[in-house]
Amino acid sequence: MEVLYSLSKTLKDARDKIVEGTLYSNVSDLIQQFNQMIVTMNGNDFQTGGIGNLPIRNWTFDFGLLGTTLLNLDANYVETARTTIEYFIDFIDNVCMDEMARESQRNGVAPQSEALRKLAGIKFKRINFNNSSEYIENWNLQNRRQRTGFVFHKPNIFPYSASFTLNRSQPMHDNLMGTMWLNAGSEIQVAGFDYSCALNAPANIQQFEHIVQLRRALTTATITLLPDAERFSFPRVINSADGATTWFFNPIILRPNNVEVEFLLNGQIINTYQARFGTIIARNFDTIRLSFQLMRPPNMTPAVNALFPQAQPFQHHATVGLTLRIESAVCESVLADANETLLANVTAVRQEYAIPVGPVFPPGMNWTELITNYSPSREDNLQRVFTVASIRSMLIK
């Protein structure tokens, strides 16, 4: 994997900097590194593809070295270099696609394709290593079964979940109380509602709670907490739990009271915030517990009083909500991230070449299913294919 990254980094630099008119002295170190790559690769044969519709391709390396010049690089020099660069880039692209198409239930973090396994051989250790990539650093650690640490912005840590629970339900669904939520990606939105606006609740207060367990622990997370859940702020028709009927939800938004968010790790509270909104920090957690209250306003103008009558029918439904959004966090496991294209790159290659469903990844690389059942085997394979995708993205956009 380190060789693949070093090849890609060298090729990217060569493509960007070996251009007509450039002073040789400005790129002499790069050209020496480029020539070392050619010397190491010459005389070797590789084969890629042969899975799904990914065609089998054979690769032979027999290229001349780039020479020295006293002045600027001329058109002939650059054209010779370009021919070599384009062949190497095509090779790297196919090695990456071959690797992204494969999976293994055992030691899935190790190279799976024939070409990448060959590149891991001792003879290729002479290629100048560049391990500056976060994915390469963490792949090396994971390969040695040591602690990794990926920095994610908008981590796709929450499997998609959208549902509701009813704490009070009447047969005609005209006097309900409960919670509804939408968890997806890096965001939780939860709303507590009471058609009667806590009319008969103790002290006219309804208590709500929403608990979310993460599939992997996060550390040093920067989080935004808001006293609102905009996705539940407009009327809607909702299917009943048994599917036998539907019920109408017509929210009137109130501000939540006594808001508390707890971040827990292995059942122990690590951080707690009360009535604090905006940016908050969570040190280490695998569970989030949100609790909040709906309080019937003790004093109401006639207009507000008309919204929340003392008896049925309740045409407007008191609602309070919270939004919790993870802006950035560190995770020991690789995840999809809204700010990265790695999952999209891997999925696109597997779809384009009709890669058959294997023993590890779900059909279509369904992220919700993958993260819901995030096994060690999936973690290993995902770390490998995301590392390869990050390498490929240097050369192929």
Curated annotation (Swiss-Prot):
Q: Which Gene3D superfamilies match?
A: 2.60.120.170, Viral capsid alpha domain
The family database entries (Pfam families) matched by this protein are listed as: Rota_Capsid_VP6 (PF00980)
Q: Which locations, inside or outside the cell, does it occupy?
A: Virion
Q: How is it modified after translation?
A: The N-terminus is blocked. Sumoylated with SUMO1 and SUMO2. Sumoylation of viral proteins seems to have a positive role on viral replication.
Alphabetized InterPro entries for the sequence: Capsid_hemagglutn, Rotavirus_A/C_VP6, Virus_capsid_a-hlx_vir
**Region ranges (Interaction with the inner capsid protein VP2):** 62-73
Q: Name one GO molecular function term.
A: host cell surface receptor binding
Tell whether Ubl conjugation is among the UniProt keywords.
yes
Give the signal peptide, or none.
none
Presence of keyword Calcium: yes
Q: What does this protein do?
A: Intermediate capsid protein that self assembles to form an icosahedral capsid with a T=13 symmetry, which consists of 230 trimers of VP6, with channels at each of its five-fold vertices. This capsid constitutes the middle concentric layer of the viral mature particle. The innermost VP2 capsid and the intermediate VP6 capsid remain intact following cell entry to protect the dsRNA from degradation and to prevent unfavorable antiviral responses in the host cell during all the replication cycle of the virus.
What does the similarity note say? Belongs to the rotavirus VP6 family.
Question: What is the protein name given in its UniProt record?
Answer: Intermediate capsid protein VP6
| Taxonomic source organism | Rotavirus A (strain RVA/Human/United Kingdom/ST3/1975/G4P2A[6]) (RV-A)
